[in-house]
Amino acid sequence: MALVHKLLRGTYFLRKFSKPTSALYPFLGIRFAEYSSSLQKPVASPGKASSQRKTEGDLQGDHQKEVALDITSSEEKPDVSFDKAIRDEAIYHFRLLKDEIVDHWRGPEGHPLHEVLLEQAKVVWQFRGKEDLDKWTVTSDKTIGGRSEVFLKMGKNNQSALLYGTLSSEAPQDGESTRSGYCAMISRIPRGAFERKMSYDWSQFNTLYLRVRGDGRPWMVNIKEDTDFFQRTNQMYSYFMFTRGGPYWQEVKIPFSKFFFSNRGRIRDVQHELPLDKISSIGFTLADKVDGPFFLEIDFIGVFTDPAHTEEFAYENSPELNPRLFK
């Protein structure tokens, strides 16, 4: 209720300051910030601008402390209602909060009811429009001076996502970097009501399920856990995905028990199981050192429970089997 009280009292700040600043973002939210930034100041016509300069010249020498000149007509003034914008922002976030409460109704054995009805299978990401692409971001070694390029767009008939580009392993000429050549596609961290950071709970599933079509290149599938510790931001769990090439789709099933633990791109000696109850994001990385064009088409990404897979962890990691790691 305190947050709602601050949100509804946002008009006090708007009346006190001439235009909203970044200090108001915690009260108004990102959507309202984008809305307010889209409002452009009206520009006077050349004729009116000259008349303004003439008026200002006539006012020189007067002993008026404050002079307010209205150079815009009533037709040019934008119809801005900050109260309405605040109400719309509050309604939007309360609608998200309602959806979160409904989605967390528990079913048999404590599992969400809609997942039980779907036989414990769930499509997490699918690509049927531009709003689905907005949930992802792409990056390459261009951020460190490399020459690789990567792009993401909708596939044919808007039924898939097409990740394509050119891979270049040429190291940047900066005198420091010795290796280069990677492209990646990473999902954005989900946000809930009032811009709260959310995570995915896949603890009732045991397999990652993808439907993809590639050009024969190997990809690295990376999963990151949700954490608030800065020291763990570079930690992830990875496994390989091999595409066949050709015009046919392939269904890829990767058990979560196969994902190995790494930090800053290096596989660690001490392995840990993937914490499925707090998944932050998933990504796909290409770094096979084969220069040239590439593509990867993705239909959907989901999770499901494979009853035939009973393995809990693929890597032996106990003090009895490897005491050197647990000294």
UniProtKB/Swiss-Prot annotation:
GO biological process: chaperone-mediated protein complex assembly; mitochondrial electron transport, NADH to ubiquinone; mitochondrial respiratory chain complex I assembly; protein-containing complex assembly
Chief place where the protein resides: mitochondrion
Pfam families to which the protein is assigned, alphabetical: CIA30
Keyword set includes Flavoprotein: no
Tissue: Ubiquitous.
A GO-annotated cellular component: mitochondrion
InterPro entries with a match to the protein in the record: Galactose-bd-like_sf, NADH-UbQ_OxRdtase-assoc_prot30, NDUFAF1
Record-listed Phosphoserine modification sites: 318
Location of the region described as Disordered in the Swiss-Prot/TrEMBL record: 42-63
Subcellular location as annotated: Mitochondrion; Mitochondrion matrix
Ranges of biased composition (kind: Basic and acidic residues): 53-63
SUPFAM superfamilies: Galactose-binding domain-like
Signal peptide: none
Keywords, ordered alphabetically: Chaperone, Disease variant, Mitochondrion, Phosphoprotein, Primary mitochondrial disease, Transit peptide
UniProt keyword Lipid metabolism present: no
The organism's place on the tree of life at top rank: Eukaryota
Transit peptide limits: 1-24
UniProt family annotation: Belongs to the CIA30 family.
Quaternary structure, from the entry: Part of the mitochondrial complex I assembly/MCIA complex that comprises at least the core subunits TMEM126B, NDUFAF1, ECSIT and ACAD9 and complement subunits such as COA1 and TMEM186. Interacts with ECSIT. Interacts with ACAD9. At early stages of complex I assembly, it is found in intermediate subcomplexes that contain different subunits including NDUFB6, NDUFA6, NDUFA9, NDUFS3, NDUFS7, ND1, ND2 and ND3. Interacts with TMEM70 and TMEM242.
Function summary: As part of the MCIA complex, involved in the assembly of the mitochondrial complex I.
Pathological condition linked to this protein in its record: Mitochondrial complex I deficiency, nuclear type 11: A form of mitochondrial complex I deficiency, the most common biochemical signature of mitochondrial disorders, a group of highly heterogeneous conditions characterized by defective oxidative phosphorylation, which collectively affects 1 in 5-10000 live births. Clinical disorders have variable severity, ranging from lethal neonatal disease to adult-onset neurodegenerative disorders.
Protein's name in the database: Complex I intermediate-associated protein 30, mitochondrial
Lineage of producing organism: Eukaryota, Metazoa, Chordata, Craniata, Vertebrata
